[in-house]
């Protein structure tokens, strides 16, 4: 990709990854502008000192920007972060689900709200230090014969002439891969995103930082949720919600026997052992949470095993639309729009990357075309740390899909993301649903 005179907004967290990303982009010829989001309200600033968007992080990012010779700005996103990430985090626990705030922050803030700042600064792209590969593919110019064989084969079988899209892949460094956290990004976001670290490993990144004498070269990676001190989410929820908003209730085992009482359904997650009443010969685990009755259901390890579940708010990527299409795409069924539709069918601003359909405006596939065929086999990750397992994915109505696991898995947790892969290519993903029939109803 020719980077001449193209301007990039780089999200800088003050860590080694985004710092080296800035250096790599600069070396590739991009005009780089560093931006750090301030996401902490002023009254919470003391607990943000060592966080990725806290005061020290801002100072570190500013120092790196100065060393690289790029401008640096701080943008206040505290109100939006509170509304879109923290409130979501708390409300999911109140609903008996276990949230994934990193996915939400990427979609809504880093690659969402930040785009308005990027446009104001005259930027063409947003870049981050994520470990993932985003390939920008232009499949020809409207002439079927113009689609290079190499592009068609490298992009999960896409041979649709004249369609511009982005393919999300796992990082070369599988231990650090973060493609899972980017699954919910829409094409309008992926097509304007750059992830320069995707083809590098963490040791290589640190070595580059040391060679540049960056002070953050050996900075320790954050291993916890950035807004939860000490990774103690229960204390955070008590502070954020207040004890009176906790939903107290009763604990039952899977046979319907009363076990005890609890101080709030928000304090539990599927697979949890800590904090449960004793008195059982075998270890007890949380196997279900019922927000309607505020009941916590416990069982033994075998009760955590699941062979099928559903996901909703599914976001399919072009790799799935094409590699698993039910039939060849029909030119007569295309829909011209000036924006890219989100899952709620509301349109956002046009992508900065025009699609090469010879002046006929931007295009997107119809809803029917954007679904893969009814069922196919893929690899599914049910949490970030999960290695992935073979599954049969069946598309359902209303942006839902059913995941069948030939090899049943432990602790499939409602509220977490299930991300679907074909080898290293992200096909899509969605949010794990709670079983429609509660455990005690069986």
Show where each model-derived region lies.
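ATP-dependent adenylation/nucleotidyltransferase module used to activate substrates
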Residues: 1-183, 194, 204, 286
């Amino acid at each position: 990709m020719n980077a001449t005179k193209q301007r990039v907004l780089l999200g800088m967290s003050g860590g080694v990854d985004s710092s080296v990303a800035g250096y790599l982009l600069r070396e590739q010829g991009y005009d780089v502008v560093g931006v750090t989001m301030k996401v902490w309200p002023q009254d919470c600033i003391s607990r943000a000192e060592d966080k990725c968007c806290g005061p020290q992080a801002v100072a570190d990012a500013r120092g790196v920007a100065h060393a690289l010779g790029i401008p640096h700005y701080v943008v206040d996103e505290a109100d939006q972060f509170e509304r879109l990430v923290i409130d979501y985090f708390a409300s999911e626990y109140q609903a008996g689900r276990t949230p994934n705030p990193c996915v939400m922050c990427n979609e809504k803030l880093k690659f969402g709200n930040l785009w308005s700042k990027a446009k104001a600064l005259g930027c063409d792209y947003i870049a981050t230090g994520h470990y993932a590969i985003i390939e920008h593919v232009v499949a020809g110019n409207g002439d079927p014969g113009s689609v290079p064989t190499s592009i068609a084969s490298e992009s999960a079988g896409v041979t649709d002439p004249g369609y511009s899209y982005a393919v999300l892949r796992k990082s070369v460094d599988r231990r650090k891969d973060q493609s899972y956290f980017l699954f919910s990004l829409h094409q309008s976001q992926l097509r304007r995103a750059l992830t320069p670290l995707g083809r590098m490993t963490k040791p290589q990144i640190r070595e580059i930082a040391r060679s540049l004498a960056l002070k953050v070269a050996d900075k320790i990676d954050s291993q916890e949720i950035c807004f939860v001190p000490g990774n103690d989410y229960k204390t955070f929820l008590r502070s954020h919600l207040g004890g009176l908003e906790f939903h107290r209730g009763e604990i039952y085992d899977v046979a319907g026997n009363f076990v005890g009482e609890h101080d709030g359904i928000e304090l539990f997650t599927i697979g949890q052992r800590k904090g449960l009443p004793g008195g059982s010969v075998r270890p007890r685990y949380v196997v279900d949470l019922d927000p309607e009755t505020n009941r916590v259901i416990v069982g033994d390890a075998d009760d955590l095993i699941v062979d099928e579940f559903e996901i909703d708010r599914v976001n399919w990527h072009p790799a799935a639309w094409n590699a698993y299409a039910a039939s060849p795409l029909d030119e007569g069924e295309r829909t011209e729009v000036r924006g890219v539709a989100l899952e709620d069918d509301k349109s956002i601003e046009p992508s900065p990357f025009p699609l090469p359909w010879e002046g006929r405006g931007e295009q997107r596939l119809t809803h029917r075309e954007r679904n893969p065929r009814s069922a196919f086999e893929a690899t599914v990750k049910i949490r970030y740390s999960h290695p992935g397992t073979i599954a049969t994915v069946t598309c359902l109505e209303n942006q839902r899909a059913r995941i069948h696991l030939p090899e049943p898995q432990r602790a499939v947790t409602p509220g977490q993301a299930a991300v679907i892969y074909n080898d290293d290519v992200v096909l899509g993903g969605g949010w794990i649903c709670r079983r429609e029939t509660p455990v005690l109803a069986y």
